Amino acid sequence: MDDPLATARGTDTSVLLDTLKINSNAKSSFIERVVMSSIKQPVIISAVRTPVGKFLGALKGFKATELGAIVVREAVKRAGVKPEDVDEVIMGCVIQAGLGQNPARQAALHGGLPNTVSAVTVNKVCGSGLKAIMMAAQGIALGDTDIVVAGGMESMSNAPYLLAKAREGYRLGHGKMLDAIIQDGLWCAFDDQHMGCTGEVVSERFHVSRAEQDEYAMNSHRKASAAIKAGKFKDEIVTVEIPQKKGAPVVFDTDEPVREDTSIESLGKLKPAFKEGGTVTAGNAPGVNDGASAVVVTSDERAKALGVEPMARIVGQATSGTEPQLVMMAPVEAIKKLLLKTGWSLNDVDLIELNEAFAVQAVAITRELDLDPEKVNVNGGAVALGHAIGQSGSRILTTMLYELKRRDAHRGIAALCLGGGNAVAMAVER
């Protein structure tokens, strides 16, 4: 007898089921088989990032869209696909004020893609870069798209100041300017406080001391510094040429924020940044930074047709939510949901990239999930490498993909918290 599943493709389901005369339970199972058979397996076939720039540092002359264009162009080149074969570009970007219409579209066209390529910009705060890749994977899985460039970009150095209520005019008194970095990137819209204050909440509720945070921050810098010296980031980074008024461009190829000289003593001298007598300081928090990263997502079928070996397949993704003031702990639930979806245990996972929104968050989540510290942020995290908020989600995934390959390891999880009390997480497998 012919396989009814094979017959089903291209046939009206209701007509087919009536023809087969099967009962309701069998119908449900049959429909599930038909649907699942049409789901494609999304894979990542290239990944790249710029070096991370300090605030007002080497990349200050580049708008977010210009940084995005650099990685879009390079991701497509590394994937070995034709620009005209790209269906869509999805880029995360948080501080969009003043960038102009649809920053992702700007990155796409300036990145060498033709006018026929669609583009969409995502704002899911610190999770924007990873959410863009999650959306790309969904499009590939459903067959809506075939090849997608996805990632994130941010230039916090170029964030504007905003003059609220200026449109109506000021009759008397002083006008108040708002810093777009703070207002749109780092300020809780619900509790009316800086995200650093939520770090203090975690410190108190989950009993994470200042000493633990400083030790974690020091180790993040040490791991990142060691990774740079060993050339571990070399393959994932695309060099950026910085134009000069005179002479040849300066080649920028190394993450700027990392400090090899970070010590417990130097960290201990810093004052609390968000609360008198608090524990969160500028030293155990990430900086505000500039950078971009992108991956190319396609189906395993298309990768085979292209003759490209995937870096990894996207196995699952998850989101979660909690009360806004506990935003730092939101990845706990996202990772738990992801493990249920994939059927993995934490013992099955080789590497975990957890965005270091603050050192206190990384310490608390590692403890809460009983993570193996030897698997978490093995080359340092945002406390050392920086946190260009729209980029970070795609940055941690990119770094993890290259480290999985270097170790010949198989499974990895990338996760981030994000303002407002949400989190995103993704599982990949080689």
What do the predicted segments below correspond to?
Residues M1-V35:
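Intrinsic disorder/low-complexity segments
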Residues V35-F62, E74, M177, S263-M329, ...:
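Condensing-enzyme catalytic core mediating Claisen C-C bond formation in acyl metabolism
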Residues C93-I147, F190-H194, D261-G287, E368-R395, ...:
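Conserved catalytic cysteine-centered active-site region
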Residues I147-V201:
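Flexible glycine-/small-residue-enriched beta->alpha junction loops
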Residues T198-E200, E236, Q244, V315-A384:
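Active-site pocket-lining segment
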